[in-house]
């Protein structure tokens, strides 16, 4: 658990630096690409410059280059995926994802035996190498045009802050757990989080499908209902079935059983949050997303510290669920309020 916790602590730092550098967030790219606005090369240029700066900063702070290379890999991944989804090139999207997922265990495990945790990080960075060719192609197809940014700076800036807040929201738990509760607890929590992330794959796929279609004005009500129903089923699996299987696969992670039961309760709220995030992005109302993430973060940080000290990793899991529920409730309220006001205007 300790080594696993250390790895995820470093990955959380990489994640934050990545999205600080990533001016053109993936969601922004999806929305504007779906609307046929040739803004991709401009976002690529600025984000890659930011990534190089992040690389240098991480080197001076940690005296290591592996995490810097991973930052560049994450940035390239986000830029390319945003373009593919915005253009609705779902076959190419699947191809790139499969290549990266196949390379991850091959390179990660292969380099781990030679270089330890540092090798795993190098392996992750190299798994994104195929994405770089798409970046080069994008620069060839579209010229850099900063005027496209200035016309849309409000939405871009709000969405940048939303993405950055969301990233901090997703990584702050590791930054809190490591120094306060320890690497062993972080290891158990990180494994639980990885399992939850696997269970949210359906949500992520639906979400990435919904954004470009909703931005293009298509009706996605049936897909929303299907997403909610699938997550109700996954919650049942996470609460009752997964805890029965885990001890045979991860005998050293006994604390994970109760954590998974608790954290699986966040699956439905997270799917609801994704549904309304897509709606707000399509409407270019990223301010709602930013506020929702801020409220969720304001719940997560204090409760994670207090509950973590009082109840250990179980308290951390409870905090995670509370933050997810709060975010979903806020989005539902704001969506209904906006719909009501919009109908009055009409």
Set out the residue ranges of the language-model regions.
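Interfacial/gating helices of multi-pass transporter permease domains
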Residues: 1-16, 155, 159, 175-197, ...
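Helix-loop junctions and terminal segments of transmembrane helices
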Residues: 18-37, 196-218, 279-282
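Alpha-helical transmembrane segments of multi-pass membrane transporters/permeases
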Residues: 37-46, 83-109, 162-165, 221-228, ...
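Hydrophobic transmembrane helix module of multi-pass membrane transport proteins
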Residues: 45-161, 265, 269-272, 277-278, ...
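Hydrophobic faces of transmembrane alpha-helices in multi-pass small-molecule transporters and flippases
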Residues: 64-68, 91-98, 148-180, 198-202, ...
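Helix-loop interface residues and adjacent transmembrane-helix termini in multi-pass membrane transporters
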Residues: 87, 114, 180-183, 217, ...
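Small-residue-rich transmembrane alpha-helices that serve as helix-helix interface/gating elements
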Residues: 121-132, 194, 261-265, 298, ...
């Amino acid at each position: 658990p300790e080594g696993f916790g250390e790895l995820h602590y470093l990955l959380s730092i990489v994640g934050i630096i990545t999205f600080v550098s990533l001016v053109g967030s993936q969601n922004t790219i999806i929305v504007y690409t779906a609307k046929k606005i040739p803004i991709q090369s401009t976002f690529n240029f600025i984000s890659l410059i930011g990534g190089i700066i992040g690389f240098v900063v991480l080197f001076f702070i940690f005296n290591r280059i592996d995490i810097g290379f991973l930052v560049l890999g994450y940035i390239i991944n986000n830029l390319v995926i945003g373009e593919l989804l915005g253009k609705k090139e779902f076959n190419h999207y699947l191809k790139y994802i499969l290549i990266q997922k196949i390379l991850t265990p091959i390179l990660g495990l292969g380099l781990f035996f030679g270089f330890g945790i540092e090798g795993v990080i190098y392996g992750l960075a190299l798994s994104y190498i195929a994405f770089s060719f798409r970046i080069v192609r994008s620069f060839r197809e579209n010229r850099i045009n900063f005027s496209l940014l200035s016309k849309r700076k409000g939405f871009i800036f709000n969405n940048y802050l939303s993405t950055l807040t969301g990233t901090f929201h997703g990584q702050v738990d590791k930054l809190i757990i490591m120094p306060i509760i320890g690497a062993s607890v972080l290891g158990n929590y990180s494994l639980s989080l990885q399992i939850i992330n696997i269970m949210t794959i359906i949500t992520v796929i639906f979400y990435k499908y919904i954004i470009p279609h909703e931005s293009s004005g298509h009706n996605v009500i049936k897909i929303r209902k299907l997403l909610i129903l699938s997550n109700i089923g996954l919650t049942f699996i996470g609460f009752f079935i997964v805890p029965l299987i885990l001890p045979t696969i991860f005998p050293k992670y006994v604390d994970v059983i109760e954590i998974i039961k608790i954290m699986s309760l966040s699956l439905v709220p997270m799917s609801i949050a994704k549904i309304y995030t897509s709606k707000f992005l399509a409407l270019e109302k990223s301010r709602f997303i930013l506020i929702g993430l801020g409220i969720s973060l304001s719940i997560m940080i204090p409760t994670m510290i207090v509950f973590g000290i009082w109840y250990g990793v179980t308290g951390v899991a409870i905090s995670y669920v509370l933050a997810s529920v709060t975010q979903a409730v806020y989005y539902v309220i704001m969506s209904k309020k906006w719909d009501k006001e919009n109908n009055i205007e009409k």
